[in-house]
A protein has these predicted regions:
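Catalytic-site neighborhood detector that most strongly recognizes the C-terminal catalytic loop/helix
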Residues: 126, 188-192, 204, 228, ...
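Short, polar N-cap/turn motifs at the start of nucleic acid-interacting alpha helices
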Residues: 173-180, 245-246, 266-285, 292, ...
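C-terminal catalytic core of Y-nucleophile DNA break-rejoin enzymes
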Residues: 121, 189-208, 216-237
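Basic, Lys/Arg- and aromatic-enriched nucleic-acid-binding interface segment
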Residues: 84, 88-90, 107, 111-163
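Short, aromatic/basic-rich helix-turn unit that serves as a nucleic-acid recognition element
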Residues: 2-43
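C-terminal catalytic core of tyrosine-transesterase DNA break-rejoin enzymes
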Residues: 154, 158, 164-165, 237, ...
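N-terminal DNA-binding recognition helix of tyrosine site-specific recombinases/integrases
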Residues: 34, 42-52, 59, 69-70, ...
Length: 311
């Protein structure tokens, strides 16, 4: 009598199985959209990695070794351009799947034993007021591709919108209250949290400037935003023209908004609401950066008075 051989559980299949649970967590509001998307993206990266290294799209979960995990981490950093924290997040997704397989007795050994993955603390870079003014003062009328990128960047510096949110910002997201104040009301693409942002004169002027732009009219958006990749490439040129040493990116604009708000005494609770943070601790990261800046700004005064003693 011959028994049937049980088909082995496959790594990417198990991953997709756990992603069904992640989707349920997303629907319940237990995790944010960006977390779920990371899990989905991790499966795609695994398939790409296995095709590249083993010429297959999946392997039995029992065949996952410590070496394969190391190779996948290397693939994330070298092939996908992941910084340390992004690579760590993806590898931890795989670790979670392996623990799921271990709990179901599909594997007998955890290949992650002895492995540690540490996220690095990253400082939030932002533009100072003089640096932002230097960007705003650039005359780019003869270089329209840079002008629209500069204007989009400045709009984000005064609203705190992330790239995906400014790209999907519709004219219907801008409202005027009974007192004539203009507001942006938009759910964040990343978390679904509502951002409620008062529009100051600068972003209002920028929105009006592009009101007749063909792309704006056709898509009913506020600004004719190009791709994130192109925008960051053009921001490098803008930084050179403005003689700014910092690495300008679309996300640095969001950090700049938080920093400028803090330095102009806007309460952190209000900043958190405008940024659409679901947890105020996320906003407090900017406050820590601000504390460091304040300390550095006091350096001249400190040098002057440190040696002075009261009689």
């Amino acid at each position: 009598f011959l028994g049937t051989v049980e088909k082995p559980k496959m790594l990417c299949d198990v991953f997709r199985e756990t992603n069904v649970k992640r989707k349920e967590e997303l629907d319940r509001g237990d995790i944010v959209k960006a977390t779920y998307q990371r899990w989905e993206r991790c499966v795609d990266y695994l398939v790409e990695f296995l095709k590249l290294t083993q010429n297959v799209e999946d392997i039995p979960v029992r065949d996952v070794t410590s070496g394969i995990i190391d190779d996948f981490e290397h693939f994330l950093r070298m092939r996908k351009g992941c910084a340390n924290n992004a690579a760590v997040r993806y590898v931890r997704c795989v670790k979670n799947v392996m623990q799921y397989a271990l709990a179901h007795k599909w594997i007998t050994h955890d290949p992650f034993i002895g492995k540690k993955y540490q996220r690095t603390h990253t400082e939030r870079q932002f533009l100072t007021e003089p640096e932002l003014k230097a960007v705003m003062d650039l005359d780019l009328k003869d270089i329209p591709r840079l002008e629209v990128v500069r204007d989009t960047f400045v709009f984000c510096c005064f609203t705190g919108l992330a790239f995906c949110d400014i790209k999907s910002l519709l004219r219907s997201n801008i409202t005027t209250d009974t007192e004539g104040n203009t507001w942006i009301r938009k759910a964040r693409e990343k978390t679904g949290e509502m951002s409620i942002i008062p529009m100051l004169a600068v972003p209002r002027h920028i929105a009006e400037k592009y009101a007749t732009n063909p792309v704006v009219i056709q898509k009913d958006v506020v600004l004719p935003v190009i791709t994130n990749q192109k925008m960051n490439a053009y921001l490098k040129e803008i930084a050179d023209l403005a003689r700014i040493e910092k690495h300008l990116t679309t996300h640095l604009a969001r950090h700049t908004f938080a920093s400028l708000s803090l330095s102009n005494h806007v309460p952190i609770e209000s900043i958190s609401k405008m940024l659409g943070h679901s947890d105020i601790r996320t906003t407090q990261i900017y406050a820590k950066t601000q504390d460091k800046t304040v300390y550095e700004d006091m350096a001249t005064m400190r040098r002057k008075f440190d040696c002075v003693m009261i009689n």
